[in-house]
Amino acid sequence: MNLAKSMYADVLVLSPEGRLDHDNCAAFHTALERYLEEPASSVARGVVFDLGSLEYVSSAGLRCFMLAAKQARAHGGKILIAAMQPVVAEIFEISRFSMILDAFPTVRAALESFSPESARAYDRT
């Protein structure tokens, strides 16, 4: 699994690629910690997970997202989900994670919910 990072104004976009399951969840969580352990004001207003390149997520992967959201909230931040592929969206819906994490159809829509500046920065790329 790869985890690409982009910053749009005051919002961090993290883009996992491939599969998120028991085999790589610990490494994924470790990679996330460096972005989530800082207070929101010092790093970013929030984090958007662009799941457009995530092919599959298991229950272990869902747990990683839940822990990330909890950690972000503890530091005054917020996590949003965007651009889920149909299979991943179905897993989120069946597991009712759509009630835990706010999801948006596009990265731009998620960015807009954080700040107009981040959406404009995204439009310039």
Residue spans for each PLM region:
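Short leucine-rich amphipathic alpha-helices used at interfaces
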Residues: 2-3, 46, 87, 115
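Short beta-strand/loop segment at the start of cytosolic alpha/beta domains
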Residues: 1-15
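General small-molecule cofactor/ligand-binding pocket signal
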Residues: 4-6, 82, 102-104
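A charged, well-structured terminal subsegment
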Residues: 104-125
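Short, glycine/acidic-enriched loop or turn micro-motifs at the edges of active sites
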Residues: 18, 53, 105, 109
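Amphipathic alpha-helical interaction surfaces in cytosolic regulatory modules
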Residues: 20-101
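Residues that form or immediately flank small-molecule/cofactor binding pockets and catalytic motifs
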Residues: 8-10, 86, 108
